[in-house]
Amino acid sequence: PGIHPLADAMSLADIEAYPWPDISDPTRVAHVAAKTRRLAQDGRYAILGCPWLLFPFERAHAMQGLDTFLSNMLVEPEFAQAMLWRIEGLCKELMGHFLDAAGPELDIIKIGDDLGTQDNLMISPALYREMLKPVHADLISFIKSRTKAKVFFHSDGDIFDLIPDFIEIGVDILNPIQPGAGRMSDLARLKKTYGKDLVFCG
């Protein structure tokens, strides 16, 4: 019902009652093996894979509405965390199927979450570390247990304050360098401060 199907959800039971997509459906990754093989045979470029759905925070606030989900992160944290972990479970399941299909030719795997505005974060660093960082860390750990591909993390906005967290949880490539987005527009500073630990892209 409506554009935010869990806008009125209040309980853990509401989350479990929602008809989540069937990630086991093989048609979701049916094209991946052949396309990866073709790109590998071409041999001119690194191969980047980007499975659908792998942005837990974005999916959560799409399901509830941004204002509602941000409020729930503060006033109903158990509910908000359950939503994030439910979505992350789907992300991991899809990622597993995708990596199985892609095989060892994959060079880079893209995940992410838009966490910034043009001049700051959407949530505080403390709230990120409490609620979202464990979700991202678990997904990245799963990826690295299944592939040698580098982890490419996309997040729009000024996310400068979270860069040490991204490095800690295993992000290899951070995207984008975004003109007009505060400290994320200063490539020289980014490279000087974090260039030994992170590749900046885009």
Please report, for each region that a protein language model flagged, where it lies by residue.
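Active-site loop segments of alpha/beta catalytic cores
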Residues: 2-3, 7, 15-202
